[in-house]
Amino acid sequence: MIYNGGKYNQHWSTKKLSELGTFSRGVSKHRPRNDTRLFENGKYPLIQTGDIKEANLYVTSHSQEYGEFGLKQSKLWDKGTLCITIAANIAETAILAYPMCFPDSVVGFNANSNESSELFMYYVFEYIRNSIQNSASGSIQDNINICLL
């Protein structure tokens, strides 16, 4: 989809999102997700889609923490990663204020610095959110596929 092909951005070239950076799905391999072993001696911040929806640009707090067992089945994402929700809360975005883990209902985006930035892409996703939400497919709970991005 191409938005705003007007005279003010004629010096920009049209690019696929995948050319602007790397999209990777969050990780939460272990089931059930509420297994207490995941959280024992927790010290690795964990956020969910609701935390991203509630954030104002940056995710600055978390309410859960993985322990070593939890981290082994997940991934600790770098500060500055743009988070994009793909399930439950569709196309909500926020940038990590510090390293955190997130589940597979979230996609992380890290920009190619010579092409874009996470901050710029945050605003791009704010602009196209409704279009992405309208593309969501699901019966009871909407979701989108990472390929849609």
Residue ranges and their predicted role:
Residues 1-30:
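Non-catalytic DNA-recognition/assembly elements of restriction-modification systems
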Residues 16-22, 53-60, 73-79, 95-101, ...:
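Basic, amphipathic alpha-helical recognition segments used for DNA target recognition
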Residues 18-24, 33-68:
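DNA target-recognition patches
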Residues 32-34, 95-96:
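Short beta-alpha junctions and helix-cap segments that line functional grooves
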Residues 84-85:
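A generic structural signal for residues embedded in beta-strands
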Residues 92:
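Short glycine-rich, flexible loops that bind phosphorylated cofactors or substrates
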